[in-house]
Amino acid sequence: MKRFLCGVLAVLLLVALCACGTQETATVRLSEVTHSVFYAPQYVALEQGFFADEGLKIELSNGGGADKVMTAVLTGQADIGLAGPEACIYVYNQGKDDHPVVFGQLTKRD
């Protein structure tokens, strides 16, 4: 759980840092595989206006599955996709030059 929360916070920090030095509002389209308690830090940040304070407008959408989230990222309908690493592996194994990158993962030890 700690690793996952660190991953989510790293994403949020990365997005926040992208807006440093600008007064304009940047829109970030975020697609998640499903609404989940694992994304609680993100939901809190949205509700508390932390992203808006940093000049970010987050457009959150429920992708309805990892395949649909990956399709949204690959077609430019989403800037960031929250899904399992297997979706990225499938695209990578197709030999695509421009493939997504996994930068965080939640692992459970039971």
Give the predicted meaning of each segment.
Residues E24-D110:
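Short, glycine-/small- and polar/acidic-enriched structural segments
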Residues M1-T27:
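Short, low-complexity disordered leader/linker segments with a strong preference
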